[in-house]
Amino acid sequence: MFSMDQDRRKEEERVRSEGRLPPGQALTLKFPVLHYGPVPAFNASTWDFRIWGEVEQEKRWTWDEFNGLPRAKIQMDIHCVTRWSKFDTVWEGVSVRTLADSGLIKIKPSATHVMQHAEYGFTVNLPLEVVLADNFLLATHLNGEPITADHGYPLRGVVGFIPGRELDTPYFWKGAKWLRSLEFMPHDREGFWEQAGYHNR
């Protein structure tokens, strides 16, 4: 236990010296589990993912179809609003920017924000420019393995910090677990926690 704490402190000093640890944050070598409500069951035969709202054509993919979309892999640091940070995490999944650039989805010029809709009606809002940035991913895998059920399997939104890149990086909670759809919107709208009084970041 003492050795693990020493390792954590040493690693924390390293990332702090590199300017990667924001003020008030502490490094964790674990991956804390934080969510509202029970973990939903996943059924691959009934699951689907929907793109809708301010798009030229609504899209709906089955689990097999979603896994056939172009894949991306990104290494990012993640920062939680509860003051822990985890570094050099490698996420794999589908980039919304790639979907747009390839014409698989066509976003209307009127779209300014995106609502992530998850199981149990949970919602998370983000500006469109964040969803289209390199540091946002519709993730299925973490560090080479499928994400676990308590971390959002089969699909979660992930937003993180890419060292050396000047990208808008909201806190990690702005990526929804158990994601089921993206709604492209002509204006911002509060998500679940914003309606409960949380800051819109």
How should these model regions be labeled?
Residues 51, 80, 96:
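Hydrophobic/aromatic pocket-lining and membrane-interface residues
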Residues 89-93:
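Solvent-exposed, acidic/flexible segments
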Residues 38, 78-88:
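Second-shell loop/turn segments in exported
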Residues 58-82:
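Flexible, low-complexity segments enriched for small/polar residues
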Residues 1-50, 55, 60-63, 102-201:
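Extended, aromatic/histidine-rich regions of cofactor-dependent oxidoreductases associated
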